[in-house]
Amino acid sequence: LITPLRICKTNEPADYRITSPDKWQYKRCIIGKKFSNSVGVSGILIEPTSQYIDLTFETMSRYGEDVGFNTLRLFHATSNHFPQLIPAITPEGLETFTPQPGETCYRWTHTQNTIQLQGANSYKEESAAIYGASLENGESGIIVHTIGNNSATYECYNRVEEYGKKIAPLAPHLVIISLGTNESV
């Protein structure tokens, strides 16, 4: 699971990047006044402030390994008015489908390290809320999803409405709760 942390004005890991030339509103699951319980599985959400959506998802190698993907699972608002986002450059063999409400899946033939999704947003911001994405390559192995926010605690995630249902699309076989620095305050 990758989340648009940089768009939310917080630290983002060095092995992926989610960027946009546009401005976004954001909400985070954190301690204090800025707490929002309307966030998705990632503990954050971004909402477009313009009539157009332009997001780029990119993986970056830290040690020279191939980190390409040929599947992007986009987690978003379950609204019937979520905008149709399409790749700026259509990858070979592209299939787009919605396996369940709140998830749009893009799958194509060959792995690549970046994909740019674009589309018109003709409804209200909350109809187009985006929570994060899973980038997958179809190879066997372990898929690890991590969820975390600066200034978030277990109690914050526990207050998010129907959080267990929001994790369900990830189909976890094991959930590990690792309490960190935020729990010590």
Residue ranges and their predicted role:
Residues 2-88, 95-185:
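Conserved SGNH/GDSL esterase-like catalytic core that processes O-acyl groups on lipids
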